[in-house]
């Protein structure tokens, strides 16, 4: 098997993965992951079923569906007074982890430093390193 890039030598196993493994082994309660313990709202389930039945199975534009970006823009303005252009100021990602690395890659230059305040999500340091920065804890 090909060796991993040297940059990965500074990374450790995910604490979340480690705690999950331990909980599974001893039958404990896993508090390290966010497992929703509630049903999805009926309207969301119905919308998903409708989309599947109507053949909505293609990739969207890479920065998110226009209707969703427009809705986010309206909510940002209504709730926070922030005016943002849904065409140029909003990108929809598959989750916070993707958003975080994409943002850091966009704003960090090699040699920059980032300050990571505790407590922190375990990806902050590795994402900073992958972006060329040195994390300071």
Describe the predicted segments one by one.
Residues 96-97, 117:
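Short capping loops/turns at secondary-structure boundaries
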Residues 106-137:
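PLP-dependent aminotransferase-like
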Residues 1-4:
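Basic/polar N-terminal segments that are highly enriched at the extreme N-terminus
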Residues 6-95, 102:
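N-terminal small-domain helix-loop-helix segment of the aminotransferase-like
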């Amino acid at each position: 098997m090909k060796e991993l890039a040297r940059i990965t030598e500074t990374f450790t196993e995910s604490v979340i993965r480690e705690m999950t493994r331990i909980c599974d082994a001893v039958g404990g309660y896993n508090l390290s992951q966010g497992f929703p313990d509630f049903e999805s709202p009926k309207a969301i389930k119905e919308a998903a079923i409708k989309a599947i039945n109507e053949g909505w199975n293609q990739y969207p534009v890479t920065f998110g569906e226009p209707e969703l970006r427009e809705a986010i823009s309206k909510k940002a303005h209504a709730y926070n007074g922030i005016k943002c252009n849904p065409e140029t100021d909003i990108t929809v990602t598959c989750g916070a982890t993707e958003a975080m690395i994409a943002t850091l890659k966009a704003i960090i230059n090699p040699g920059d430093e980032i300050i990571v305040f505790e407590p922190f999500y375990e990806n902050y340091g590795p994402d900073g390193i992958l972006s060329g920065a040195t994390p300071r804890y």
